[in-house]
Design a protein with these regions (language model features):
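Short, surface-exposed beta-strand/strand-loop-strand elements in extracellular ectodomains
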Residues: 34-53
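Extracellular and analogous surface-interaction loops
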Residues: 14-21, 71-75, 114
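Surface-exposed loop/edge segments in extracytoplasmic proteins
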Residues: 2, 48-56, 92-94, 129-132
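C-terminal interaction-tip segments
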Residues: 1-22, 26, 30-35, 39, ...
Length: 171
């Protein structure tokens, strides 16, 4: 039976704990980020033995799937756990402009392409303030997770720091 994970961000995450007794034959990794590639480290680790990399710094293009098969490691008690670490994509300048009016969580865009350029979890930088996208409702309407500090100047070149998004399937 396959196990599925949606992984985001740059923190190391445990996919399988040592002692899970999961038989691993194949691991599929898909970059689901809309606008940037990401790097993947996939490794097994055992206490007092160390880390053994299956993939190290492998770049996953947008929408690409990498299938790692012919894999065999022990996931029994006191054996190996399976871990993943992602590296986010490069910062880019968004299309259009953003004019924040007041201390609220709205992200009003003009000629922006939120639905194709942003994903929930991405950070945007508007007039020097950085916020995390919590929802996207259209090309010119989005919401951030924390209120803006003030009525900001119209930013004609807002930046996006995309968060790595990878789907993992373990068979």
């Amino acid at each position: 039976m396959a196990t599925h994970f949606n992984i985001s961000g740059e923190l190391t995450q445990e996919l399988l704990a040592a002692g899970s007794n999961v038989s691993v034959n194949k691991i599929s990794l898909t970059n689901t980020q809309k606008v940037s590639k990401c790097k993947v480290d996939l490794y097994i680790e055992k206490k007092l033995t160390g880390k053994f990399y299956l993939l190290k710094g492998v770049e996953l293009p947008i929408g690409a799937t990498l299938v790692y098969d012919d894999i065999n490691f022990s996931n029994a008690a006191n054996e190996f756990g399976l871990y993943i670490k992602l590296t986010d994509g490069a910062t880019f300048t968004m299309t259009g402009s953003i004019d924040v009016t007041g201390t609220n969580t709205n992200v009003p865009g003009t000629n922006t392409l939120y639905t194709s350029e942003l994903s929930v979890g991405d950070e945007i930088v508007v007039s020097g303030e950085t916020r995390t996208i919590s929802s996207i409702t259209g090309n010119t309407t989005a919401v951030v997770s924390a209120a803006w500090g003030s009525d900001l100047a119209n930013d004609t070149s807002p930046d996006c720091n995309p968060t790595a998004l990878v789907d993992v399937i373990i068979n």
